[in-house]
């Protein structure tokens, strides 16, 4: 490709609404153009990156035995109503009506449609296993779309779905896909981790996220440097303390703490470690009738150490707390006789259900709210001042330095961007939609399913978050819009420069290299700035002075300076750099 034929449109400054590096650089490099909130046009330079991502994904999906298809973007609501997701998904699911008043959705994912396809066609165990995938446009009506392609409303996703006869074969299919994902991300040339994850609303009990490591990542990734253990923050287990609880050494005392409504403030006032304070979190669960009317509400009190944060996913798995909400102020005052900031498990106005974090269950001589404004209670002990807790659970986020659940060291935490996710679904969707097959005995069985997603348009943004500097993007070779750029200096003035550039360009094309020749006639400074911003990994500069010495200049995008290369062997040199 020659630059004069291509569409190159760079900006010196990023738009004001571009908040993160990838959004800023993709806009400045002319890779995307904003059309509306969370909706972008993929410009030629950006589309080349996306197509390379798609090609790698497609090759590895095919290699893993998956078969490509395409499902509709607009889907009849009746399939989503079968699984209950038409109501459950909330406003993120874009619902529309046609001219006849019939309900449709704009797909955010396609479990319902693929399950309908398979229940029509799969009749016998002899037709299994099957694995189908698509690379297709999706839409989620994000409340606050931001960060460019990182959190857009319209995006491209690869979603695959496996179908098996039983759990064992379904989990084997899951492992085949998980290995395919590792090959995909290895080929992208990105630093990533595959981490154990919670399946969330999509269902199932086996799940991994593929996270691109980046300091700006939204997700906390928990791992053990001494082993292969890795999980996201929602999934990572905080083990119980290994030592026995110490005996009580303090009397329980009601202590004045005027205007000290946080554990940190109380600890500072009393001159005690923050980890000896206990925070009280009040939740509620509602029981409803068939019409959705609340007929009974249960109030819950959760106790966590003052230096720990509640993990909402873990809390939601405590028996009875599925679908919890935070209690309202009137509910809190009714049960505790006090506003938040001074709450505790003693002197309640009405009974509540108590759930205690593992760390709090091991505390002695701890501090909590007195259920009275401006007062806390010090020296609280289990068994003496409060009955031993009946319900103890892991309620918190782990912190760096906690023991690893695999017993092979301590945990560390880094940031990541989720770009892929694999799930074993089981029969969640096949049961809801009555998707069955006949086994060897002629008896109907529900299809065992897995689903596997990769954010095709999110991945380039994640790659930029991991690979950039003050000059612009630094693409890995595998997904760069072009692998090599040739920059001739003043080719209109120096025929030998133009000839050398054309010759090398032709040789690289013949060798199958994705090369672009910048024949726009730009000044060297402007030309170099463009390609550093765009992030092409290999740059060859051809100038008249260097040619007279038999040399070209080569610079990798990560290098601070260029190096001299013998013009006669430049092609072989570049082939070596490109591992051709």
Curated annotation (Swiss-Prot):
One of its GO terms (cellular component) is cytosol. This is Proline--tRNA ligase. Catalyzes the attachment of proline to tRNA(Pro) in a two-step reaction: proline is first activated by ATP to form Pro-AMP and then transferred to the acceptor end of tRNA(Pro). As ProRS can inadvertently accommodate and process non-cognate amino acids such as alanine and cysteine, to avoid such errors it has two additional distinct editing activities against alanine. One activity is designated as 'pretransfer' editing and involves the tRNA(Pro)-independent hydrolysis of activated Ala-AMP. Consists of three domains: the N-terminal catalytic domain, the editing domain and the C-terminal anticodon-binding domain. Its EC number is 6.1.1.15. It is found in: Cytoplasm. Its main location: cytoplasm. GO terms for molecular function: aminoacyl-tRNA deacylase activity; ATP binding; proline-tRNA ligase activity. InterPro entries: aa-tRNA-synt_IIb (IPR002314), aa-tRNA-synth_II (IPR006195), aa-tRNA-synth_II/BPL/LPL (IPR045864), Anticodon-bd (IPR004154), Anticodon-bd_dom_sf (IPR036621), Pro-tRNA-ligase_IIa (IPR002316), Pro-tRNA-synth_IIa_bac-type (IPR004500), Pro-tRNA-Synthase_IIa_type1 (IPR023717).
């Amino acid at each position: 490709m020659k630059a004069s034929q291509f569409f190159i449109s760079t900006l010196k400054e990023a738009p004001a609404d571009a908040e993160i590096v990838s959004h800023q650089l993709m806009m400045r490099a002319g890779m995307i153009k904003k059309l509306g909130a969370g909706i972008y046009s993929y410009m030629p330079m950006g589309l080349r990156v996306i197509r390379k991502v798609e090609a790698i994904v497609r090759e590895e999906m095919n290699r893993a035995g998956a078969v490509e298809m395409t499902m509709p973007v607009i889907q009849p609501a009746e399939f989503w109503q079968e699984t209950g997701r038409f109501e459950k998904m909330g406003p993120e699911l874009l619902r529309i009506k046609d001219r006849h008043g019939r309900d449709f959705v704009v797909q955010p994912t396609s479990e319902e449609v693929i399950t309908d396809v398979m229940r029509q066609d799969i009749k016998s165990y002899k037709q299994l296993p099957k694995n189908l995938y698509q690379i297709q446009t999706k839409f989620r009506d994000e409340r606050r779309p931001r960060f460019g392609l990182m959190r857009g409303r319209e995006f491209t996703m690869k979603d695959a779905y496996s179908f098996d006869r039983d759990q064992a074969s379904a989990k084997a299919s899951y492992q085949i896909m998980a290995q395919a994902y590792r090959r995909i991300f290895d080929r992208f040339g990105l630093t990533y981790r595959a981490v154990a994850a919670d399946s969330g609303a999509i269902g199932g009990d086996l799940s991994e996220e593929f996270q691109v490591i980046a300091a700006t990542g939204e997700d906390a990734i928990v791992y053990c440097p001494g082993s292969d253990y890795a999980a996201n923050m929602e999934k990572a287990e905080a083990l119980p303390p290994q030592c026995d609880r110490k005996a009580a050494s303090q009397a329980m005392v009601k202590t004045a703490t005027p205007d000290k409504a946080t554990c940190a403030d109380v600890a500072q006032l009393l001159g005690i470690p923050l980890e000896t304070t206990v925070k009280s979190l009040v939740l509620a669960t509602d029981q409803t009738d068939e019409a959705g009317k609340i007929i009974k509400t249960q109030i819950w009190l959760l106790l966590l150490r003052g230096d720990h944060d509640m993990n909402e996913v873990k809390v939601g798995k405590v028996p009875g707390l599925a679908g919890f909400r935070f209690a309202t102020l009137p509910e809190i005052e009714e049960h505790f006789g006090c506003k938040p900031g001074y709450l505790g498990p003693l002197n309640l106005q009405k009974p509540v259900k108590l759930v205690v974090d593992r760390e709090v269950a091991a505390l002695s001589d701890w501090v909590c709210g007195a259920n009275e404004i401006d007062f806390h209670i010090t020296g609280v002990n289990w068994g003496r001042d409060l009955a031993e807790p009946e319900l103890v659970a892991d309620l918190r986020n782990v912190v760096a330095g906690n023991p690893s659940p695999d017993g092979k060291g301590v945990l560390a935490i880094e940031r990541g961007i989720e770009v892929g996710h694999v799930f074993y679904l089981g029969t969640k969707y096949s049961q809801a939609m009555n998707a069955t097959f006949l086994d060897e005995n002629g008896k109907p069985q529900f299809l065992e399913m897995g689903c596997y997603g990769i954010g095709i348009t999110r991945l380039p943004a994640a790659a930029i978050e991991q690979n950039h500097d003050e000059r612009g993007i630094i693409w890995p070779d595998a997904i760069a819009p072009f692998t090599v750029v040739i920059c001739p200096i003043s080719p209109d003035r120096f025929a030998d420069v133009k000839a050398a550039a054309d010759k090398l360009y032709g040789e690289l094309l013949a060798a199958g290299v994705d090369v672009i020749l910048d024949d726009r006639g730009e000044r060297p400074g402007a030309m170099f700035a463009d390609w550093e911003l765009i992030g092409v990994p290999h740059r060859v500069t051809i100038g008249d002075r260097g040619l007279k010495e038999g040399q070209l200049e080569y610079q990798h995008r990560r290098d601070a300076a260029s190096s001299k290369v013998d013009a006669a062997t430049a092609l072989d040199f570049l082939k070596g750099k490109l591992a051709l």
